[in-house]
Amino acid sequence: MEKRPFLTEEQAQEIIQDVPTPFHVYDEKGIRENARRINKAFSWNKGFREYFAVKALPNPIILQILKEEGCGVDCSSLTELMLSEACGFTGSDIMFSSNQTPVEDMKKAYELGAYINLDDATMVDFLDRVAGIPENIFCRYNPGGTFQLGESEEGFQVMDKPGDAKYG
């Protein structure tokens, strides 16, 4: 499958006439198709949901498109939580995964009913003290161990020592 740009050079030149540079152009059709593709690929897994990392592209229009395609958001800060809330994400639409989390961030995640993903089990007491324990709580897990280095058909290398990684 040959990957072609969604925007021709001529189209880009036309846009430049009306829009100051630099600027970003997004492919809504491509974004929707990719969201549908990933949801279809994991449709065998009842309850699967893709959570888009807001930090990757904190653009309300893109977040709204992903919401319409059934995706949730993965937030790591108060700002990302507030942006997601403004875009209509609440409750299980939000996965909150944060390091060295300030109290205000944790309170907001709890207030929104987000799935809260903790770095380790010791954070449970902190969460309980500052916000309370939600109905669902998650904890990152690093399986450790050593695995033989391999390569996928696409040429991607597989990590061989998850114990060396922050979260496996």
Predicted regions and their residues:
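ATP-grasp fold ATP-binding core
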Residues: 136-142
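Residues in well-ordered beta-strands of folded domains
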Residues: 97, 140, 168
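Short secondary-structure boundary segments
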Residues: 120-121, 141
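Generic structural motif
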Residues: 57, 142-144
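Active-site loop/helix belt of alpha/beta enzymes
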Residues: 130, 144-168
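A charged N-terminal "starter" segment
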Residues: 1-115, 121-135, 150, 165
